[in-house]
Amino acid sequence: MSMMLSNWALSPRYVGQRNLIHCTTLFHTLTRWAKDADDKYHDINLMYENMFTPSNDNVSILQDEGKSDYDTTKTSSMQEDISAFNKDLYNFYNIGYAKQIMSASQLENIVKAKGRFVIQSLSTSPYYNLALENYVFKNTPRAKRGPDNCRLVFYINDRCAVIGKNQNLWQEVDLAKLKSKNFELLRRFSGGGTVLHDLGNVNYSYLTSREKFETKFFNKMIIKWLNSLNPELRLDLNERGDIIQDGFKISGSAYKIAGGKAYHHATMLLNADLEQFSGLLEPSLPNNMEWESSGVHSVKSKIKNVGIITPNQFIAVVSERFQKTFKVDGEIPIYYCDEFKSINDEIKDAMNTLQSEQWKYFSGPKFSVKIKDKGLTIKVEKGMIYDCDRNDLIGLEFKGFLENIDSYT
């Protein structure tokens, strides 16, 4: 760990789990084509296929069961060399080797039992990751006595804009630019402002009891942990509880409190493609529109990447310090999951909600908009126009009205 941390600036750029899956799929396709073309190359083709396919023999059951992540008891020297190469490849990119992914039943049993743990999602689907986070929060039991069941969840999302539950999306994002840059739009289950994610950003979620919850607590811990390992980072906390570096925001937070429990989830900009973020949070609406809304408005801030830490290094450091700091009885285990194996009906239902137009466009706060040069005032609730100076507009979807505003005005 210390060697890795002392060489942050030299570490390779993050390569996501999904990229590795794509690489595996490519090699499978190429080797199948080669085998069909000429069987005499079968052995060499199989070797390259295996180089990018973790063997089931090398996979541990679960980290907390104490089995080795790497098994060298192979009868073939070639297989030993290939397995060693695979391990070196994984370690070089800080992905880890042969992480055992929990099944749906394992996930349910672990989440619903008492105890502390870390979960890292290997999925980059924002719909799955937000649904997983929601599942862990809702199903974490309240501790009736003794230590609380605090948990830590990590996930990395592919390109997306995530607005708060109580935000008016029309004032927060440019839908056309999101679409042109292949960013998904999500409305999360918690409050707060709008944030942008990509594979260079890590999302973390700290869950604890309502009694022990304090909005700035976990970010203070992260600042302490990272600054102690590399003082050159100079991380600090602003008055809103956001983590900043040299006056630039590198982490934004949101919170949820329900059922005697609470969570603080936040972003951490490490190697994000900030050029792609440009303009996405600047709605391109006509200047003649004047808005009134009771919803939460995002606070615009200058942002930057931390730059000298990769996503996997950040996850490793914070996980290790969490394990040491919150250890009570026995070690705090780390578990892994994805949207293919670690999924159940409750997570699927949450994903369906997050993906639905009803949740994205037809929820959120009431608002009104005045089109000044037309003398027109429109009032909207749940995405529908319910009051207007013109009766022919009442009952229309506001989304459709805005997309065809020239024809209506």
Curated annotation (Swiss-Prot):
BP GO annotations: protein modification process
Q: What is this protein called?
A: Putative lipoate-protein ligase A
Record organism: Saccharomyces cerevisiae (strain YJM789) (Baker's yeast)
Which family does the similarity line name? Belongs to the LplA family.
Q: Which domain of life is it from?
A: Eukaryota
Q: Which GO terms describe its molecular function?
A: ATP binding; lipoate-protein ligase activity; lipoyltransferase activity
Q: Which reaction does it catalyse?
A: L-lysyl-[lipoyl-carrier protein] + (R)-lipoate + ATP = N(6)-[(R)-lipoyl]-L-lysyl-[lipoyl-carrier protein] + AMP + diphosphate + H(+)
User: Which residues make up the binding site for ATP?
Assistant: R188, G193, T194, V195, L196, K249
Q: What is its EC number?
A: 6.3.1.20
Q: Which GO terms describe its cellular component?
A: mitochondrion
Tell me the route in metabolism or biology where this protein functions: Protein modification; protein lipoylation via exogenous pathway; protein N(6)-(lipoyl)lysine from lipoate: step 1/2; Protein modification; protein lipoylation via exogenous pathway; protein N(6)-(lipoyl)lysine from lipoate: step 2/2
Q: Which InterPro entries match?
A: aa-tRNA-synth_II/BPL/LPL, BPL_LPL_catalytic, LipoylTrfase_LipoateP_Ligase
Keywords in alphabetical order: ATP-binding, Ligase, Nucleotide-binding
Something else the entry says is: In the transfer reaction, the free carboxyl group of lipoic acid is attached via an amide linkage to the epsilon-amino group of a specific lysine residue of lipoyl domains of lipoate-dependent enzymes.
**Domain BPL/LPL catalytic, which positions?**
146-330
Q: So what does this one do?
A: Catalyzes both the ATP-dependent activation of exogenously supplied lipoate to lipoyl-AMP and the transfer of the activated lipoyl onto the lipoyl domains of lipoate-dependent enzymes.
Question: Which EC main class describes this enzyme?
Answer: ligase
Q: Which gene encodes it?
A: AIM22
Positions binding (R)-lipoate in this chain are: K249
A Pfam family that this protein carries is LplA-B_cat
